[in-house]
């Protein structure tokens, strides 16, 4: 008697498993056929459907490229832009400057230039070396006789009161 019940229970579990996997597959098919927020209706003609989908993808790609061009401030006259670059090769080439559409706005350029390549006293996006910036690892005090310590840098005068002792007893 118990063997019969276990067989029925196993059959019921198998049916539940089949139904749940079928429902999950149907859900994933519905999700994969979505474009944006609307549902693409499936037609009997698959060729027309695939052509429409390809056209939509091409349109979306073109719109994204146009948007990227507008964001980066690229001009259609490439020659004019290169002439301007030849005239103005100065101290800005070591900074990461993003070309904005309104180049006359100096404040916007300063804000963009705030992000430098390395993490110094004020590097990155405004902040100095933070814990998230693990790629820049430095050892030691990075001061000393050869490097010059903080001489000629901001805050050098304030830091002279704190003297570190070297073992040789030279008093400065």
Curated annotation (Swiss-Prot):
Signal peptide: 1-25
GO BP terms: antimicrobial humoral response; defense response to bacterium; innate immune response; sleep
Domain of life: Eukaryota
Segments for region (Disordered): 27-172
Biased segments, Basic and acidic residues type: 35-50, 58-90, 97-108
GO CC term (a single one): extracellular space
Biased composition (Basic residues): 109-172
Other information: The name 'nemuri' means sleep in Japanese.
Localization annotation: Secreted
Parts forming coiled coils: 45-74
Keywords: Antibiotic, Antimicrobial, Coiled coil, Immunity, Innate immunity, Secreted, Signal
Reported tissue expression: Detected in the brain where it accumulates in the dorsal fan-shaped body following sleep deprivation (at protein level). Expressed in the adult body.
Gene: nur
Protein name in the entry: Protein nemuri
Function: Antimicrobial protein which is essential for the homeostatic regulation of sleep. Promotes sleep following sleep deprivation or bacterial infection and increases survival following bacterial infection. Likely to promote survival to bacterial infection in two ways; by contributing to the innate immune response and by promoting sleep during sickness to aid recovery.
Induction record: In the adult brain by sleep deprivation (at protein level). Up-regulated after bacterial infection in the whole adult body and in brains of some flies.
Deleted gene: phenotype: Adults display disrupted sleep. Consolidation of daytime sleep is decreased, particularly in males, such that the number of bouts is increased and bout duration is decreased. Adults are more easily roused from sleep and have impaired sleep rebound, thereby recovering sleep more slowly after sleep deprivation. Mutants infected with S.marcescens or E.coli at zeitgeber time 18 (ZT18) show a significant reduction in infection-induced sleep during ZT0 to ZT2 the next morning.
């Amino acid at each position: 008697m118990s063997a019969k019940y276990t067989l029925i229970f196993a059959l019921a579990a198998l049916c539940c498993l089949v139904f749940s996997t079928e429902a999950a597959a149907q859900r994933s098919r519905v999700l994969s056929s979505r474009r944006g927020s609307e549902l693409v209706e499936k037609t009997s003609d698959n060729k027309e459907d695939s052509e429409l989908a390809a056209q939509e993808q091409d349109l979306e790609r073109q719109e994204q490229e146009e948007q990227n061009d507008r964001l980066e401030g690229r001009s259609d006259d490439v020659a004019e832009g290169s002439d301007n670059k030849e005239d103005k090769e100065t101290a800005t080439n070591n900074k990461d400057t993003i070309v904005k559409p309104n180049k006359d706005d100096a404040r916007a350029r300063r804000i963009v230039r705030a992000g430098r390549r390395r993490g110094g006293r004020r590097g990155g996006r405004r902040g100095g070396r933070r814990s998230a910036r693990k790629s820049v690892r430095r050892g030691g005090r990075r001061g000393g006789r050869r490097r010059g310590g903080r001489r000629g840098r901001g805050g050098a005068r304030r830091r002279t009161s704190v003297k570190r002792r070297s073992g040789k007893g030279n008093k400065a």
